[in-house]
């Protein structure tokens, strides 16, 4: 199975979701000066920012990570977290990334997710990678 890459703000909601998920994952650093580069296909798990608008929905650190052409080329799907209080903008970062990068938006969950979200993502990620061609 390929990996998960995620970003978590200082609230650590996404970090807690990843820990409960129990799958291999690499964190995009909170410090914008630190960089990572991935070397295998991955699914991105990202929180949504901005209080409901498109502008600012994707964290700057994630934009910087995806601006690296090598990292962007290995992206295979996106999972977004958000806050249902933002209505239609709930999980907006997933919409933005999926559309701009041409990858499927696989799932969204609220804040740090429920046990049902954990089970759905674990199962969905496994099934997603099983459907992918070997050299994808």
UniProtKB/Swiss-Prot annotation:
<dbReference type="InterPro" id="IPR004465">
    <property type="entry name" value="RNR_NrdI"/>
</dbReference>
<dbReference type="GO" id="GO:0036211">
    <property type="term" value="P:protein modification process"/>
</dbReference>
<dbReference type="Pfam" id="PF07972">
    <property type="entry name" value="Flavodoxin_NdrI"/>
</dbReference>
<comment type="similarity">
    <text>Belongs to the NrdI family.</text>
</comment>
<dbReference type="InterPro" id="IPR029039">
    <property type="entry name" value="Flavoprotein-like_sf"/>
</dbReference>
<dbReference type="InterPro" id="IPR020852">
    <property type="entry name" value="RNR_Ib_NrdI_bac"/>
</dbReference>
<protein>
    <recommendedName>
        <fullName>Protein NrdI</fullName>
    </recommendedName>
</protein>
<dbReference type="GO" id="GO:0010181">
    <property type="term" value="F:FMN binding"/>
</dbReference>
<comment type="function">
    <text>Probably involved in ribonucleotide reductase function.</text>
</comment>
């Amino acid at each position: 199975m390929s990996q998960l890459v995620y970003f978590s703000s200082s609230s650590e909601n996404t970090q807690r979701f990843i820990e409960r998920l129990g799958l291999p994952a690499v964190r995009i650093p909170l410090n914008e000066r630190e960089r990572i580069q991935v070397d295998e296909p991955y699914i991105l798990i990202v929180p949504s920012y901005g209080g409901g608008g498109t502008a600012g929905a994707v964290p700057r650190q994630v934009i910087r990570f995806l601006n690296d052409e090598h990292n962007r080329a290995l992206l295979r799907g996106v999972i977004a977290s958000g806050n249902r209080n933002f209505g239609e903008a709930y999980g907006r970062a997933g919409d933005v990334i999926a559309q701009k990068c041409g990858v499927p938006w696989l799932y969204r969950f609220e804040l740090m997710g429920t046990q049902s979200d954990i089970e759905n993502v674990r199962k969905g990620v496994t099934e997603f990678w099983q459907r992918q061609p070997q050299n994808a």
